[in-house]
């Protein structure tokens, strides 16, 4: 990182913003902040209602930059602590929900004046003073906030949607169209209110995440159990979690057994059995036993805190579609102003048209040109999709990755820990000699492997524990590790060997026949590591160990193929026989074996050259270079490792693949909805503008087309909150 970038990061200040009414206003606020002295850069996160300021600026300066919308700005830490203090102060009155009639009183009053205006119109006539005054009252009351911003924009020659509306209303009033001017004001206010409502609904998914973890925990201090706020809990403290309580902090169980519902973090609906040395996460539910948990992270570093932070950051990342809309809107509004002026002036000047008629048509063009629907077409979709994904245990770190995942043509899977569980288990055990019983032989194997450093020894120890096979009374002498071959040890005067077929070939064991060797090869061809137990005279048995394939892997690959992703490739460092056995079992379309980390990286680059958009899924640790090189890097088990959350573009918080097809479906649906929104928003404008040619465009049609498009686009985007994990 260069020094300027480093300085920029160090001077970053994050503020919460209250009062955003639309995405366009957020963009304008960002522009104003960037122009402040001492500010090097600024970035508004409309989805999270935040702004990142790089440089030095006071809260007063920031609020002045947002005065056009009466924005209120709070430093993030202060905002969070204030919100928390209000929540926890039991004496403080609960925040009352503002009734609809109070929240929108000016809008309701303006609508009432319109109703009375039309009543007066029918009774007293159109040109009656009372009728006109009622419509004027509706315009002034309903359009006060609109005009306040619109006039400021006109003075600065800053053309946005409020400028268009202000000019349209003033123009309509000048030519005496009081009724239609008041209708434009009220319908525009309704449109803005609906936009705010839609965005608040989309943001609610993140607010609900913030309330998942308790804010206090029962902690053991000086031999006493006391309730402490999570901000005051330190790493190393012992937390007591009773049955039915939510876990407040991340930690490791030091005492107790329970089933913990981790749906809030991983999306898994089935409770997970937890015992001593298992990790637990803040926000998860302890369903059964009493647990004593040693705290391993401060509150700001817990998994749920990182998820919330990264999801908010993700919502602020502009997706390619949003970048297109922002760029388009920048030129769109001035072009609409020019078209409206031409419509109003050209026909009367050059073709003898009526000034009243064509000025009216020009004003209608201004109203049609309001880009409300276009501006919200992408942000509501992105916020809804990312929030929904987070609730289902899929952490997507930006709109750009959401879009790219929907366009992938191939997915590469790291084998170990992704398609397989990453933990070796005993799959086969056969006694081949009548001189020894099965339990006795396994006891000998366990006693020898207990002294071994071989990675597969843990599988044998676990199997012995499950089958209650004791080995502590088996005395092993002269234990030796035979590098690359196996192990040996003396038990009751007999030397036993455990190792590869190669070891027993070298020992010239008499019953190592071709038939036996073929049986071993059958196990090896199934992707298992076969080990032989025997003496230098005879073979006593064979034991096979394998990295067990996940139950969900085959189904996930099938679902991806059904979604049209035909290229599913397994990358592994295993030998070809093992790789082919596992690959055939799960159903991947291609297998690449005996790969080093650099080979995986090179293969991903090759895939990108062939297929364009390529995703790579792994554990985010030893395959980090390949994840980084892919179009979209997806990490498994994000709940258990900070590395996975930090390095990947997308993290599956649960330690299984079942969320991957859901993530692909959600991203594709998001892409389709964004495209449909943009097409519809632009299409409805074009249709309305074409009504100018026969002179059919009215202010009524213009504002209704704009409001209708805004409502439909918002509702269409909110559908993404309801996409289910099938």
Swiss-Prot record:
Boundaries of every HMA domain copy: 11-74
SUPFAM superfamilies: Calcium ATPase, transduction domain A (SSF81653), Calcium ATPase, transmembrane domain M (SSF81665), HAD-like (SSF56784), HMA, heavy metal-associated domain (SSF55008)
Keywords: ATP-binding, Cadmium, Cell membrane, Ion transport, Iron, Iron transport, Membrane, Metal-binding, Nucleotide-binding, Phosphoprotein, Translocase, Transmembrane, Transmembrane helix, Transport
Enzyme Commission number(s): 7.2.2.21
Protein task: Couples the hydrolysis of ATP with the export of cadmium.
Catalysed conversion reaction: Cd(2+)(in) + ATP + H2O = Cd(2+)(out) + ADP + phosphate + H(+)
This protein's GO CC annotations: plasma membrane
Thylakoid found in the keyword field: no
Membrane topology: Multi-pass membrane protein
GO molecular function, one term: P-type cadmium transporter activity
Underlying gene: cadA
Active-site residue list: 414
Family stated for the protein in its record: Belongs to the cation transport ATPase (P-type) (TC 3.A.3) family. Type IB subfamily.
GO BP: iron ion transport
Record InterPro entries: ATPase_P-typ_cyto_dom_N (IPR023299), ATPase_P-typ_P_site (IPR018303), ATPase_P-typ_TM_dom_sf (IPR023298), ATPase_P-typ_transduc_dom_A_sf (IPR008250), Cation_Transport_ATPase_IB (IPR051014), HAD-like_sf (IPR036412), HAD_sf (IPR023214), Heavy-metal-associated_CS (IPR017969)
Binding, Cd(2+): 22, 25
Subcellular location: Cell membrane
Enzyme class: translocase
Bilayer-spanning residue ranges: 105-125, 129-149, 163-179, 335-355, 363-383, 671-693, 698-720
Protein name in the entry: Probable cadmium-transporting ATPase
NCBIfam families on file: ATPase-IB1_Cu (TIGR01511), ATPase-IB2_Cd (TIGR01512), ATPase-IB_hvy (TIGR01525), ATPase_P-type (TIGR01494)
Annotated organism of origin: Staphylococcus aureus (strain MRSA252)
